[in-house]
Every structure is written in C-alpha cells, then in structure tokens.
Amino acid sequence: MSLKEWTIMIYMAGDNNLAVDMAYALEQIKGVAEVGAESPNLFVYYDGNSPSIPTLYCDFSEPGKAIYVRSYKVPDKLYPVSNAKENENAADLRSIVNFVDWCVNRVQVEHKGEISYGRRAEKYALIFSGHSLGFQDIGLFKDETSGKSMTMKDIYAVLERLTMCREELDKKADDNKWEGDLRELSTKLLLGQPLDILGFDSCVMGMLEVGYQFSNMTKTMIASEGSVPSAGWTYAKLLGCLAREQNRNLDTPSVAELFVKQFIRTQDAYTVGGVSVDMAAWDLCNFEYLAGAFDELAEVLIKCFKDPASRIYRQMERVILHVHWKCQTYMYDQNVDLGDFCELLDRECGSIAEEIGGNDVKILQEIQQACRQVGEELRRSVILSGFSGGSYQYSNGVSVFFPWSREGYEVSRKNYKSLWFSKLATKKRLSWTAFLEKYLYEVSVRRLELPDEDVPVGSRYRYYSGVKFHEDLDSIMSGNGNSATKIAGQEGSKIAGQEGSKIAGQEGSKIAGQEGSKIAGQEGSKIAGQEGSKIAGQEGSKIAGQEGSKIAGQE
C-alpha cells in the first residue's frame, strides 16, 4: 500500500463550551472522506464535555468507513495518562502524544485483505482546536472536567517528542534528558520529521513569539492574530480542497495558502453579522531572520531612551505613544500587528526628522531602516495573510506583545520571559523584552515629586503618610513604585486574565465585546448551535464600510 501525501491530525480540546461546535466540525471532517480514495489520511481527537460521551479517536481516512474508537479502550498506550477515565484530560500533553502514536503506528488498516498498522504519509499536519490566548497559559486548551489547562512549555515538549528522528531519540534516551512528564525512556518513532503544517484553530496564536517558539519543529504554521469564532475553521472547505484532483500535487506553502483563502472567503459571508476574522500562513524557516530584524529595531529604540533630558528621548516618547495608539491591536489591546507598527513608526520618524534636524536625525534614520528591514523579513515569512470584516483590516499576519502599562506587562511577565525554550533563543533573549521593561517601567511612567515642607498658598501640599523605607523611596523615584497597590499578577488583584475576573465589563465574555470567540474559555458565553444563540457576532456593530475581504500576501 503506497503512502498518501498527507496525514492530517486534528486535536479538538472541547471539554468546555466549544463541545457542540466541535461536534458539528467533526461531521464536516467526516464528510471530506466521502470525496474519494485520494482524500488525505484524516484523524480527529474529540474530547467533549458530556460525561456520557467518552473521548474519541476518529479515523476518516477511507470513504464510507469512518472508525470511532473510545480512547480509554486503546491498550498499551505509549504514555499512560494518570487517572484515565472515559472522559480523558485533553489538557494532558500525554494525550496528544498517544493520539499521534495511534494515528501513525497503531490504527488498524485493511487493504486488499491484508492487515497493517498506522497511516503514515509523506507529509504531516497537526491542528489544535480549542481555547487559547496567545503565549498566555490562561485557559490554553482548557479541560473543564479535570480543571486543567496546557502550557506553552507542554506544547513545545509535545512537538519536540513528535518530530524527533531515530538518532535524536536514541541519544536522548541514552543521556536521560527527558523533561517533565515525558521522562520515560521511550525510543518509539512517531513522526520522525518536522511537521509540514502546524495549525491553531484558536485565538491569538498568530504571534511572532509563538511562531519562533516552534520554528525548529515545523515548516509552516497557520494561525490568527485575533479571535477565532466558536464555530472554528470551515473544515469542509479547507480539507475538501486537498481531495480535489487539481490540488493533489500542491507543495506545502500552496496548501497553506489555500487554507487561508478558503477560510477568509467563507467567513466573509458573516461580516453582515459583525464577524471579523484574520488568518495567516507562515514560512517558519525565515522566522529566525524576522526575529533578528525585530531584535535590531528593539535595540535602536532602547538607544533613544538613555537620557531623559535629551530631545530624542522626549520626541520618541510621543512617537511611540502615538504609533501604539493608532496601531492594529489584538488580545484586549495587549498585542500589536508587527507590520502595521513598523509602517506607522517609519512614517512618524520620517516626519519628525524633517522638523528637528541636527544629530537626532541619524538615530531616526536608523529606526526607519530597522522598520523597513522588519517589513522585508515579514514579507518573506508570511506566505499569505488575509482578513474579513472591519476589526482586523490593518493586519499583516504577525503580531507581537506590546501592553499599555507595566500592570499589563506584570500579569504576563512570567509567561513571556519563559517563552524562549529553543536552543537558539536561550543564548540570546530578544531585546524586545528589554525595550518593554525600559518603556513601561520608566519612559511611560511619571516620576513622583518629592514633598516640600515650605508650601506656598495655592500650590499642592505633598505629604508621605506612614513610614517609608529607603528601598520604597528608590523604587518610587525610579518610576517603579508599586508599594501597597494591587498590581496585575499579584494575589487578589482584579486584572483581566485572572480566573474569575470581569473582562471589559462583561461578565462571562470571551473577548471584549465579542461573543462566541475562542479566547481562553470562560463560562457563560453563548455557544453556536444552541437555540437562540448568537454565533461569533457583535450585535449592531458597524463594519468598516468595505465589501468583501482583502487577501494580503505574496503570489
């Protein structure tokens, strides 16, 4: 039996309010197999939130022969899941590894009377469907039955294990370097090669930081900078394209491009309901260069803020604020589109250079050159990006973390600083982290004025109440004073992103003002498919006055 070109595995972490939508998607995927014998190998892991429905392994690879297997009945799993029940914990990284092992090594295949095991292929795609919030670990592929969520480190460990070749497995087993729950010295080959496509049918994963994290383990990544509707990807359209005769010999970038086009076109029909989406396909082989160019930009920006008394310091303080305000944003305005940010920054620096002249022009020109270099690398990295609706119309395919305040940074700092797990990144942390800390903790914060005992009539009387220690005063004078305040990330604070908080004034909302998106799952949302529900729309919203969608990318 000859290898098919593609084995596509879809991991549906639906033990939450996405269960019904994922059940519909499951039927869409099953329908793709009816196209014909040339359809790809199709597998789905489905974990719903009904206690009466067990977690399922589904094989839709052959027309008319859909196979459903209860996960808990699969014997001798590679990595047994602790306290395994009928409803499996989809947020356990071992569940992912076991599912992929079943797809490529264990599923029974009958062909012309002969029995074999596993459906291998020339190319592999792994698509995660569920809740996410970018690099944050808040609600990542949340499993409500177990009360657990995944972490970015979990996903990294999973992809590393899946893609290891025989030599790497043998060496790692000999050196006993397994980490976390994958410490068992298993040398069983899974994919044995980098993923051809890594997809995230979930919110806010289209970040430079996320893509760079996985750039050594996958060739192409498909993700969205903003929110994804609860209904998720239109799998019937996306996967059905692969089964068409004219598309069977497409290379991987062309397949990824096809996914983006089909998703944007199908979602365009829902703009009348206020639905806005974006999606991009990336060539991760170029992400090292994109990250390097972005690193150079961050270093130049840091140079601008060495002397608070300098003219360039004051000018760039205003420029950054202005550009940040106008830029395309995502994730409660905590992320900015990288292309839009650099384009606006380039333009503003050019305007200022014409006005101020002098020695400051040189550093402004350095910023402009760095912005243009980021733009060039971005165009090389983004195979195709697209949007539909008005909310994401300035998207260019890749976003970066840029919160508005030190409080917003503090709530995410631990996760953000732990992102760089790959060998290349641990040698040199990107300077953007240093810029964020410089800008948010010093540049954008007003310094406290010292109290004055001699207060003239009509002025403000400043007085320190209570006892102040020297270290508190030093912190306050440097603009970092957080004493006796409720700072994001501290226990008891009410900052968006903490469990149980009220985000954007809407209790139980998924994302500010949008119902039904796949933002790090919170209870209380309205699920598509239920009577009277609203599917991923904004009631009464106005759509940027544009007909149709705009596909932005490379031919």
Residue ranges: model-predicted function:
Residues 1, 112, 118, 134, ...:
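Terminal, contiguous helix-loop blocks that mediate binding/assembly
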Residues 1-122:
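N-terminal extension/subdomain marker
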Residues 7-11, 41-46, 124-128, 196-200, ...:
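Structural recognition of the beta-strand scaffold that forms the well-ordered cores
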Residues 119-135:
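Active-site groove signature of glycoside hydrolases
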